[in-house]
């Protein structure tokens, strides 16, 4: 039997009305709670170090760090304070940090923070922090005073569990071939 046009209109009317209604109801809906959020900072002198320190101060469970150059006292202090309040803090540094005069490598190692040296590459040029498995901080911004006060740098703070999981996986890959640093 072939349906007439009136029957066809009736059959399609309900799904179309439901679809249009759903679109209207969700048009102004807020983003999903797990939708990525981000903030970007630039330097010199536009708050990148303070943004980093604030994120570290808010950490609850774990902070994983990969740093090429690490001489910032405020960042090193924030990591040590997080460690003291029970946050699992672990650091991977480029091999040159063990001989740099103003490196924070000794400070964090002597604070009891597991510190690893990634000597498997020409340079371990990562500038990454992963906080609580949900926040990734990365960019050209080295964890140094010069990056905050003198250099043209960028720092991106992204809250996204899926992205953080990828960064954690990469962090673990580098940790596996790095060696423990006890400090000088």
What is each PLM-predicted segment?
Residues 39-41, 64-66, 90-93, 116-117, ...:
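Structural recognition of the beta-strand scaffold that forms the well-ordered cores
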Residues 52-114:
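Primarily the HKD phosphodiesterase
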Residues 103-150:
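Surface-exposed, polar helix/loop patches in the mature regions of secreted/periplasmic/lumenal proteins
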Residues 131, 136-184:
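Signature of lipid phosphatidyltransferase scaffolds
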